[in-house]
């Protein structure tokens, strides 16, 4: 999993096929098994397959996941969950939500927990968990249909995998960034939180210094809009460049950690077990409460 591959994954939503092929040229894929999840037309997909073959790829496998299954709702019932749910949301894209999802998965698995997970990237199956269903982004379905369908989708995962904890990554942002970049109006986060009730919510922010007033206002926003309060704030290393605010695609720059004291987490906290211990303590309290 090289930096070049990571660049393709991060940018494929707005890269042209020529840019994708150029990026793939940099990858050392000879004699390797290549997995891909196609979100292209058949001609562009074939171009990528041909390039991989010409570069000596050992095998090329199209990933087929639960996210490819068509939306289906058998009844208008919202099922309750017996498993604690940890959700990762963000104020926007490029707030390192996926890094957080991988961090949580790794730490919980290392501690011996059985984890089920639905992530924000279309290639989550490469990391042995489910991608967000495609119909969550399909405008032909109503919000109501998506709420019931996601509830049933996650319930099937719980019944089949029998996890001890479920991790959900919420795509896009919870609110619009500006008039140009609406970030789906936060609808996906609203639909997910209407379908399930997270027991622990991590909110990822753009890089910057934040006041307690801002954090309180953000918590009130999720409390009344998503019906869940924020347990932790995470400050990412990315910040949108002001020169791209009104352009078709925003550009992000990498920045070092800002000073926010102990009230916010950042990438350095992933190097210790303080954060994961806090999460486990909260989930343990949840389990004890359920038993009582």
Residue ranges and their predicted role:
Residues 52-88, 120-142:
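Short, flexible helix-coil linker/hinge segments at the edges of structured domains or between repeats
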Residues 103-144, 219, 223, 245:
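N-terminal phosphate/diphosphate-binding loop that engages ATP/GTP or pyrophosphate donors
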Residues 71-118, 215:
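Walker A (P-loop) phosphate-binding motif
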Residues 36-53, 60, 66-68, 148-149, ...:
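Conserved catalytic-core segment of NTP-binding enzymes
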Residues 1-5, 9-12:
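Single conserved hydrophobic/aromatic residue that forms the stacking wall/gate
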Residues 10-20, 176-182:
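Glycine/threonine-rich flexible loop motifs
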Residues 59-63, 262-275:
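Short acidic-hydrophobic, aromatic-tinged amphipathic segments that line or gate anion-handling sites
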């Amino acid at each position: 999993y090289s930096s070049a591959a990571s660049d393709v994954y991060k940018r494929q939503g707005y890269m042209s096929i020529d840019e994708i092929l150029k990026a793939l040229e940099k990858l050392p894929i000879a004699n390797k098994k290549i997995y891909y999840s196609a979100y292209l037309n058949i001609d562009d997909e074939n171009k990528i397959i041909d390039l991989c073959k010409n570069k000596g790829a050992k095998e090329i496998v199209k990933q087929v996941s639960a996210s490819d299954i068509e939306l289906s709702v058998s009844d208008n019932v919202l099922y309750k969950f017996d498993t604690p749910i940890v959700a990762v949301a963000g104020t926007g894209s490029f707030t390192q939500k996926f890094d957080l999802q991988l961090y949580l998965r790794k730490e919980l698995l290392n501690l011996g927990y059985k984890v089920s997970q639905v992530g924000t990237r279309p290639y989550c199956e490469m990391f042995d968990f489910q991608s967000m269903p495609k119909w969550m982004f399909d405008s032909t379905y109503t919000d109501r249909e998506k709420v019931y369908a996601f509830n049933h989708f996650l319930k099937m995962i719980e019944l089949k995998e029998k996890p001890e904890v479920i991790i959900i990554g919420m795509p896009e942002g919870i609110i619009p960034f500006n008039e140009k970049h609406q970030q789906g109006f936060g609808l996906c986060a609203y639909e997910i939180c209407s379908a399930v009730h997270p027991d622990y919510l991590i909110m990822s922010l753009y890089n910057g210094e934040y006041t307690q007033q801002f954090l309180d206002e953000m918590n009130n926003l999720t409390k009344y809009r998503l019906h869940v309060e924020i347990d932790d704030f995470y400050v990412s290393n990315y910040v949108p460049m002001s020169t791209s605010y009104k352009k078709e695609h925003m550009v992000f720059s990498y920045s070092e950690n800002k000073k926010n004291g102990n009230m916010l987490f950042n990438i350095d906290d992933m190097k210790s077990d303080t954060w994961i211990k806090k999460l486990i303590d909260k989930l343990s309290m949840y389990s004890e409460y359920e038993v009582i």
